[in-house]
Design a protein with these regions (language model features):
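Structural/interface elements that position substrates and couple domains in central-metabolism enzymes
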Residues: 1-75, 82, 87-139
Length: 139
């Protein structure tokens, strides 16, 4: 699989600069989880971070939603921290809610999910860390 079409530097830079609201799918209260530290980082640098995880009522003091469909706010980026085998339904849901982009974190590689999102009009980033990319492009 050629990941380069899902790692376009100008798209990454535009998403990081123009986005305001990021739904973190797989957000966690477990401080050792990457999704926890990145959720915290997103809040600290000024994004509206919306956690998505059916196992929590809140993450980092922010109301947590069981699914993307439960969120009433317009989502700019859906940042995905789930096993690649679980992301097709997340991509479908991201399209259904009208998200602008889906960002599959490092190691989350599923071309079928990326194609679903892309065909649905979303920008797609895959196998890149949003925190590292922010530090590279913005900081």
């Amino acid at each position: 699989m050629n990941l380069s079409k899902y790692q376009n530097e100008s798209v990454i830079r535009r998403l990081l600069n123009e986005s305001k609201t990021i739904a973190v799918y797989g957000a966690s209260n477990k401080i050792w989880r990457t999704s926890h530290s990145i959720s915290k980082f997103l809040l600290e640098v000024g994004y509206e971070m919306i956690p998505v995880n059916p196992n929590y009522d809140e993450v980092l003091g922010v109301k947590c939603f069981p699914t993307l469909s439960d969120i009433e706010t317009q989502i700019d980026i859906v940042d995905v921290f789930r096993h690649p085998s679980e992301v097709i339904t997340i991509a479908e849901e991201a399209v259904q809610i009208g998200a602008k982009a889906i960002w599959f974190q490092e190691g989350v590689i599923n071309e079928a999910a990326a194609e679903i999102a892309s065909s649905g009009g979303l920008d797609v980033i895959m196998d890149r860390c949003i925190l590292k990319e922010y530090n590279f492009h913005i900081n």
